[in-house]
Amino acid sequence: MYDKQDKQAVAIIGSGNIGTDLMIKVLRDAKHLEMGAMVGIDPASDGLARAKRLGVATTAHGIEGLVTMPNFGAIRIAFDATSAGAHHRHAAVLREHGVTVIDLTPAAIGPFVVPVVNLFAHLDAPNLNMVTCGGQATIPIVHAVSRVAPVRYAEIVASIASRSAGPGTRANIDEFTETTSKAIETVGGAARGKAIIVLNPAEPPLMMRDTVYCLTEEEADTDEIESSIRAMVSAVASYVPGYRLKQAVQFDRYTAANPLALHANERRAGLKVSVFLEVEGAAHYLPSYAGNLDIMTSAALAAAEQIAASRVAA
């Protein structure tokens, strides 16, 4: 058990689906965090109404409303679940007040963070970017391969239910691909990365599916790669219980005589690793098919919990 004084107060900026799901996770599961404020701009939003019913302090006046709340001085960590454009302004205001920011938008002001890969390197960063839903699902796999064999090229395809993609996701499609591609390289360890997102209109909606392709050396050890991948899947599932391999890891060897076509004008020999994932949401607030949103809120919560725990330990 943890005493109340061991917990750090958090604010959630953005009272939409992601912000509301994150609030419920903090209230249900957090050991080192407590809700300090839910911040929105729509007084009629379900997220603000739900927060009030749960006894959480609220404001419908955005970042300006947050800094004038009586308990703002107690806020140590803020989650931004708005948009990349809005985050730049929010980050500047919160930085002035010494509040650590966990950014769930593609703004990428701070370092990219995937909890199982590089969180401990950034515990003291003032602003941490959680990449994207596709990044949180696939970068651990790229890293799992790259830690045992060099990854020359990695490509990920994130397929999400169209119904789970709100206006923020749709408005940030370009940022999604750019941010995820960059993080595949800088966090995942691939020499080159590419990201594709697919909005699946199927009804009933399908769960999030992710495909990861990695090209490594032709002589790479398949047993070592598969063992590393399975260990990584278990690590991610420790904070995203619905994260799992959909089928066995697949390997295809391409020789100089029969190279793999990466692009129209590029062919390479090597070992192609194909990993197929499924992410089922916890259905705390969002439907279970919205694993793309659940993995973001779960990763953000895991990051904040570790940051808060490190402060308590200090």
UniProtKB/Swiss-Prot annotation:
EC class: oxidoreductase
NCBIfam families: ac_ald_DH_ac, PRK08300.1
Any Pfam family hit: Semialdhyde_dh
Coiled-coil region: none
Family: Belongs to the acetaldehyde dehydrogenase family.
EC number: 1.2.1.10
List of catalytic residues: 133 (acyl-thioester intermediate)
Binding site for NAD(+): 15-18, 164-172, 292
Keywords: Aromatic hydrocarbons catabolism, NAD, Oxidoreductase
GO BP field: catabolic process
Gene Ontology molecular functions: acetaldehyde dehydrogenase (acetylating) activity; NAD binding
Family matches, as InterPro entries: Acetaldehyde_dehydrogenase, Acetylaldehyde_DH_C, NAD(P)-bd_dom_sf, Semialdehyde_DH_NAD-bd
Highest taxon in the source lineage: Bacteria
The protein's name: Acetaldehyde dehydrogenase
Reactions catalysed, as given in the entry: acetaldehyde + NAD(+) + CoA = acetyl-CoA + NADH + H(+)
